[in-house]
Amino acid sequence: MRGPKPTLQEIVLDLCPYNEIQPVDLVCHEQLGESEDEIDEPDHAVNHQHQLLARRDEPQRHTIQCSCCKCNNTLQLVVEASRDTLRQLQQLFMDSLGFVCPWCATANQ
């Protein structure tokens, strides 16, 4: 191309009819040999399910955002609990547990 704008004469298209479909080999011909490193033995195998269950029992920090039951101000709590304990706390929230902000707590005393 010469000049700032392409012209039709400068564009060269090399079009060939492609009527014949050529097959493509999609088979992988790779062969793997047996190796002692690749064989998982029960002593060296990692049990991921056991690790996940153990992690559930570990206490983790969770941020809970709720409203004051008196003035509806937003409260933010940080708790450290296991997954099961957090579920119990969630049930308490759904049932009858209410939180009071520090301002409403001191005003009512």
From Swiss-Prot:
Any one of the GO CC terms: host cell nucleus
Domain notes: The E7 terminal domain is an intrinsically disordered domain, whose flexibility and conformational transitions confer target adaptability to the oncoprotein. It allows adaptation to a variety of protein targets and exposes the PEST degradation sequence that regulates its turnover in the cell.
Main location: host cell
Region (E7 terminal domain) residue spans: 1-41
Name of the molecule in the record: Protein E7
Motif LXCXE motif per record, residues: 26-30
Matching Pfam families: E7
Transmembrane segments: none
Cysteine disulfide links: none
Keywords associated with the record: Activator, DNA-binding, Early protein, G1/S host cell cycle checkpoint dysregulation by virus, Host cytoplasm, Host nucleus, Host-virus interaction, Inhibition of host innate immune response by virus, Inhibition of host interferon signaling pathway by virus, Interferon antiviral system evasion, Metal-binding, Modulation of host cell cycle by virus, Oncogene, Transcription, Transcription regulation, Viral immunoevasion, Zinc, Zinc-finger
Record function comment: Plays a role in viral genome replication by driving entry of quiescent cells into the cell cycle. Stimulation of progression from G1 to S phase allows the virus to efficiently use the cellular DNA replicating machinery to achieve viral genome replication. E7 protein has both transforming and trans-activating activities. Induces the disassembly of the E2F1 transcription factor from RB1, with subsequent transcriptional activation of E2F1-regulated S-phase genes. Interferes with host histone deacetylation mediated by HDAC1 and HDAC2, leading to transcription activation.
Motif stretch (Nuclear export signal): 86-94
